């Protein structure tokens, strides 16, 4: 029997009530491959400005008896500059590092690749699409010529993917924690040394945010949010 819209809404809201920023994970409990794939797929399917998907997700296995040599190396190297991830590194099963592309603009090879190869736009429409994106960057969001602002715009897109992954994780009972507590310059250097920021023929990457996944080893905490009337303004 098909679920009613209200039933689905209640399940989603119940999952949000259950979810918390997990500060302590149980190192003996692992996320199944199926659940991990579902979470990552939710991120991959996230919407993005102009549909440009300016992201990449690095999946670091934190289990010493499962992880690749590179994952174990990253686990060790990231501990010092990622003060907000240390509890996760000590117990979570996975750390997902969300990268954002740098210098994405209408003339970049990456945008042309997305238009032609991924979106498969008609050839006569590609100039119109590129012109619209250029106008957006130059005249609407004042991004043109500002590398940091353009990178921050790309980072904003990764947070949409992050939100999708957080929601999927909560819906299937996997605990998570979004992470911004890290030294961006130091993490970029580590990832660059590992060859993980190289965009190949397209734009290179920089770190945006992180997400840990596993199962909590902590008591539930009361969710505290501002009252709806202080947040929602119905016009």
What positions do the PLM features span?
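Acidic, surface-exposed loops and disordered segments
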Residues: 2-235
